[in-house]
Amino acid sequence: MDQRQRRILGQPLSIPTSQPKQKRTSMISFFSKVSWKLRFQKREPLKNVFFILAERARDPSAKKRHMAMRNLGTMAYEAPDKVRKYKKIVLDLLVYGLYDPVNLEVIHESMKTLTVVLGKIQGKGLGSFFIDITLQTRTLLDDENDSLRYSAFVLFGQLAAFAGRKWKKFFTSQVKQTRDSLLIHLQDRNPQVAKACKTTFQACSPYLKLKEEYSFQSEEDQRNTKLYQQLSHYHPEILQFFYANKIL
């Protein structure tokens, strides 16, 4: 792989600083996705792709770490079969980003990408990653950042659908420790977070063994495992649109 190819791979482009930060970020994201599509079209050896992503996921630069998480999300959309094949490598990098010690953007991007990846693999073969993801996601349910809270509730609800027999006992203990957060954020100051919390609360109700009157279940507003598995295919931004427009 020559130097020009390496430069194409998701590195931030030189954009005039006079542009608004949000616009610069969206342009970087756009060109990053384009570069990844070109790489898949050229069938770049995956070992090279993962080697570069692994380097950037651990780079001292928060921007490069953030870009690595975003590129993994692009990969999940563009080549879900490859993600399923190399899920252990992908999950390892995403969990590493989820535990980023200093940068909330890296953590947030990791959560959003995990939501996509877990949907693609239907929660199968998570192994001990299930524990790592659950423990960290729990800590973010009460974060001051609205976007982080929203993504954390979406991901936690998804984990409830994929716990299965293997992790039922563990996840039950986690849900019980999270009960106060679930109840508090049903009245979250951000209405979109509150709706995400309500959906997650319903997903977690079986683990809490709540009585019917406290389970928020009704004929018009009933959720089940199949629905959560369907929702898991959506990116958090799409779910946010559903919530905002009262589709859910």
UniProtKB/Swiss-Prot annotation:
Ubiquitous. Its main location: nucleus. The keyword Nucleus applies. The keyword Nucleus applies. Keywords: Nucleus. Pfam families: HEAT_MROH2B_C. It is found in: Nucleus, Nucleolus. Residues 1-21 are annotated as: Disordered. HEAT repeats lie at residues 128-163. GO terms for cellular component: nucleolus. It comes from the Eukaryota. This is Protein maestro. It comes from Homo sapiens. The gene is MRO.
